[in-house]
């Protein structure tokens, strides 16, 4: 509300969430390392399928003796490892804090991965008998996500073809394992490898292994946040403070769809998509505060000004 807006500018008119980063401690030097690994198994969350009747996608066919549970075989165990290192040191005058963390994970669907690096550096200092306080902080982040699966829909979702494939295999045709190892086949007419699947090219589904191998995508994000704060105590009642903040974000995305992909979402020769965006937000404020306690009353007053500038640009290309 108004108090938050007075302290943090007009952007905080509806409230503010303050995130305070760690800083060094006086008289102590600490080095900390931690490592954490988690495993994820998607097999426990997939639907239950009948394995008694074969046939095509529109109806059940003849009774069969059973079907391999290829849906569970499609998924792998996802593994995420987080390693972090921090260093803190300080004296009465200056305190230093540095940290680095790496997150690397592989998803439950093949060829998907996440690699993330976080750096943080903070320096705090006090001068002039603690009348002047300086606080500087820089955070750097780089993230690379490869082959992020489609969250829903038909054409880009490998689960569509996985779940709709006939139990026991296609009548008079091949098993699911065949389409797993032969998700692409050589087309003599075009002299190239094209998608191999039991349905027509525009049936809302594609070979799941074609989607995970022949539609690679890569999303990279770079982010830098820098903060600087200066606070000077003029006397017992007045304090003047200046703060500055810069937040830069760069996103890069690339996706390739090889020839043979469903022509509802790609051309006969494939499709190429690339996007790049850069956003910069700069904020600064200057504030004079007054505080005095008179018996059972406390008087607080603030006077200040703030400035904010947001800019961004983006460029993209889509061959389809």
Q: What are these model-derived regions, one by one?
A:
Residues 21-23, 89-91, 125-127, 230-232, ...:
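Residue-level signature of outer-membrane beta-barrel architecture
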Residues 25-68, 108-109, 118, 122-223, ...:
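Surface-exposed loop/interface segments of Gram-negative outer-membrane beta-barrel transport/assembly proteins
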Residues 82, 114-120:
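Transmembrane beta-barrel architecture of outer membranes
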